[in-house]
Amino acid sequence: MASVQASRRQWCYLCDLPKMPWAMVWDFSEAVCRGCVNFEGADRIELLIDAARQLKRSHVLPEGRSPGPPALKHPTSKDLASTGSQGSQLPPPQAQAQPSGTGGSVSGPDRYDRATSSSRLALPSPALEYTLGSRLANGLGREEAVAEGARRALLGSIPSLMPPGLLAAAVSGLGGRALTLAPGLSPARPLFGSDFEKEKQQRNADCLAELNEAMRGRAEEWHGRPKAVREQLLALSACAPFNVRFKKDHGLVGRVFAFDATARPPGYEFELKLFTEYPCGSGNVYAGVLAVARQMFHDALREPGKALASSGFKYLEYERRHGSGEWRQLGELLTDGVRSFREPAPAEALPQQYPEPAPAALCGPPPRAPSRNLAPTPRRRKASPEPEGETAGKMTTEEQQQRHWVAPGGPYSSETPGVPSPIAALKNVAEALGHSPKDPGGGGGSVRAGGASPAASSTTQPPAQHRLVARNGEAEVSPTAGAEAVSGGGSGTGATPGAPLCCTLCRERLEDTHFVQCPSVPGHKFCFPCSREFIKAQGPAGEVYCPSGDKCPLVGSSVPWAFMQGEIATILAGDIKVKKERDP
């Protein structure tokens, strides 16, 4: 009775599993089961059928499968009676030597007679042989069985996914059945053939050669190229690296880290070329947008069977500012005019600039802070003091973003003196505070305490200034504790070593840590007199924004920051007198 039920089953074209007739849907170009229709959706079934048809055609091996017997018929009661004693067990391996002339029978030996001829494809795994042989009892005509041979062609690639040594051992363990392999098959044969491997290796070699040439041009600042090309490449290279992702699948993220210009033969015009690492940290480098877009398009599998209809720029998005969640279409940054160097890239579309690590350090794992999460988080205002231990390990958002891009051992890593680590910054500031206010090492910090509003602190605070510091989340009362407050913003102020800190408005030199720092723009620093005059000019009503006159947005949002009432009262208080360096 089980054989009768098996003969009524039909095979789904997509999942390739036996289904009862009532579970099949015949409304499409191929018979599919209701499970596949419900899982994939009726609107996508035809696309998947086309993709499956192309895959099965492209994976059919040259040897193919012999059509075998001319026809199959349903088992009769006489056949069932003759095979009743054999239906519960598989025949021994020697049964393969029987001739395959029993076309009208569905008995057990028929499962193995397909492997007797050298022109037929034999599967090394007994489980796969059983799966293939059991399909002969589905009652299909030989015309449909030919299509079934192509339909099941994907099974031939399954053993190739195993290590070659394991596959060779499995084949040798079959004894006499190992001789039934087709002449063109080899246990150690690669999945896509030697031609595919050679083509892949050649592509990688060409891409690395182009990348080497691009890095050499970057080191020489593209000497000998036209001025427009040179300036464009320098501007774009200053913005690298930055993230790119696939528009239809945001989980596919790569990283653009280099640019170059290639000459086009017709008019000897130059065309922009960018180099992308995808996925991030994999070390796989793609030259050009089309190559990485094709790979992302293939990995997304949203619309299999289709090809890219454009150059790939409309399928990719780039991150305008790292960690902000602001993604724009790559075609807005690299327009046709920009790619042909006829016009400069729009300044408002350029990605946020970060230190550019070497390509070797680009793919390394990001460094870890001792006990802090390095993911950029939006700043939030705090009205209560924090313990000094937590303050010492705090990093600003700018510092987090910089450390995200720099890998250990790179030219901008935390171990090098170019960009000091938070511990080194703390030591430098402590030494500066201990020697002289004019020491260049003391000019690299600000008093931003992690909140969204400006703050000010001093190394030797009077009691009136203790309230100001506590209001902004830092409860230091000694020069050492004050250095901890400065270390949190050492990398976020953007000040270069040796450059004096000056007020953005009056250009007067600022005391080491006595100034108002804009939390959004590192270059916005204001002295207390200018901040006081700005607050008074705004009047008592309304919000008081950045003293520069701009409404600087908070990191990760479009909402501008504003002074808190406690901060306004502290800045306007008359008992705070900031001592300038020029004062005696």
UniProtKB/Swiss-Prot annotation:
The keyword Chaperone does not apply. It catalyses: S-ubiquitinyl-[E2 ubiquitin-conjugating enzyme]-L-cysteine + [acceptor protein]-L-lysine = [E2 ubiquitin-conjugating enzyme]-L-cysteine + N(6)-ubiquitinyl-[acceptor protein]-L-lysine. Residues 354-369 have a biased composition (Pro residues). Pfam families: IRF-2BP1_2 (PF11261), IRF-2BP1_2_M (PF25457), zf-C3HC4_IRF-2BP1_2 (PF25454). There is a cross-link at residues 227, 438 (Glycyl lysine isopeptide (Lys-Gly) (interchain with G-Cter in SUMO2)). It is found in: Nucleus. Keywords: Coiled coil, Isopeptide bond, Metal-binding, Methylation, Nucleus, Phosphoprotein, Repressor, Transcription, Transcription regulation, Transferase, Ubl conjugation, Ubl conjugation pathway, Zinc, Zinc-finger. Residues 59-120, 346-421, 433-495 are annotated as: Disordered. Its EC number is 2.3.2.27. A zinc finger (RING-type) spans 503-550. The modification Phosphoserine is found at residues 66, 125, 186, 371, 384, 421, 436, 453, 457. Residues 503-550 are annotated as: Cys-rich. InterPro entries: I2BP1/2_C3HC4-RING_sf (IPR044882), Interferon_reg_fac2-bd1_2_Znf (IPR022750). Residues 197-217 form a coiled coil. Residues 82-100, 449-458 have a biased composition (Low complexity). One of its GO terms (cellular component) is nucleus. Disulfide bonds: none annotated. Interacts with IRF2. Part of a corepressor complex containing IRF2 and IRF2BP2. Interacts with JDP2. PANTHER family: INTERFERON REGULATORY FACTOR 2-BINDING PROTEIN 1, MYELIN TRANSCRIPTION FACTOR 1-RELATED. Belongs to the IRF2BP family. This is Interferon regulatory factor 2-binding protein 1. It comes from Mus musculus (Mouse). The gene is Irf2bp1.
